[in-house]
A protein has these predicted regions:
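Conserved class I S-adenosyl-L-methionine
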Residues: 1-60, 79, 181-184
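A short acidic, Gly/Pro-enriched loop at the edge of an enzyme's catalytic core
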Residues: 122-133
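Short N-terminal helix/helix-N-cap motif within the alpha/beta-hydrolase-1
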Residues: 97, 144-148
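C-terminal alpha-helical "lid/dimerization" subdomain adjacent to the S-adenosyl-L-methionine
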Residues: 24, 44, 164-216, 220-222
Length: 226
């Protein structure tokens, strides 16, 4: 089995148990709260902070073109997209099962400005300089070809556009690093190598005119301007 297939199989398990995944991300279930505390060292306030910080670069009145990759179940972003009625939003994911959850959520919420595309972040099916914002929440630590993913997300972004989001970075919180190495990587949820705060800053500086990185425990939160 190729690494791509391993990751697809792992995320298929999550896609088929969307409520479990959503509970972990939003801390809305007991297991979600336990994992946030045990694995990530997060309490309620810190968990809310990384989400707020990652989404902060998106203006409240945004009416341009936005690409989210990967969309996952859409639990964090569909409520936002419903409010951005004037925006043209495209959501891409490698896992059809995860994306089905997002599609159902968008339909239930009446987010009619969102379309869904199955695809690979390492070979995005979009033309150059197509989007005003590219958003990526907790995806890069799972992508098999991170170099291609960084190149492609930059390629489809318009000059002056914003690339923002978050993902796991190593070296910030030892307990998280241990769980990632001994549990998340063997299960195929995360794929090494992983960035540090310093290596991520160097990488983004090489691609963008301006880049900012800060952390909430092991969440590396970034905002870049092309």
């Amino acid at each position: 089995m190729s690494r791509h297939d391993e990751i697809k199989a792992s995320y298929k398990q999550l896609g088929n148990t969307g409520t479990l995944y959503d509970g972990i991300v939003t801390r809305s279930t007991l297991i979600g709260k336990l994992l946030d505390s045990l694995v990530w060292g997060l309490d309620k306030e810190l968990a809310a902070k990384w989400i707020e910080d990652a989404l902060a670069p998106i203006p409240e009145n945004f009416a341009g073109k936005l690409l989210e990759v990967p969309v996952g179940t859409g639990v964090l972003t569909m409520p936002l997209y419903k409010k951005l009625a004037g925006a043209d939003i495209t959501c891409l994911d490698y896992s059809a099962d995860m994306m089905k959850n997002a599609e159902r959520r968008a339909e239930a919420m009446g987010a009619s400005n969102v379309r869904f595309v199955q695809g690979d972040v390492g070979a995005l099916p979009f033309r150059d300089e197509q989007f005003d914002i590219v958003l990526s929440l907790n995806g890069f630590h799972a992508f098999p070809d991170k170099d291609a993913a960084f190149r492609e997300t930059c390629r489809v972004l318009k000059p002056g556009g914003v690339f923002c989001g978050c993902f796991y970075i190593r070296g910030e919180f030892g307990r998280t690093d241990w769980f990632v190495k001994h549990m998340y990587v063997p299960k195929g949820f995360f794929t090494p190598p992983f960035e540090t705060r310093e290596s991520l800053m160097r990488r983004l500086d090489g691609l963008y005119s301006r880049a900012e990185v800060h952390t909430v425990k092991s969440e590396g939160i970034f905002c870049c301007k092309k």
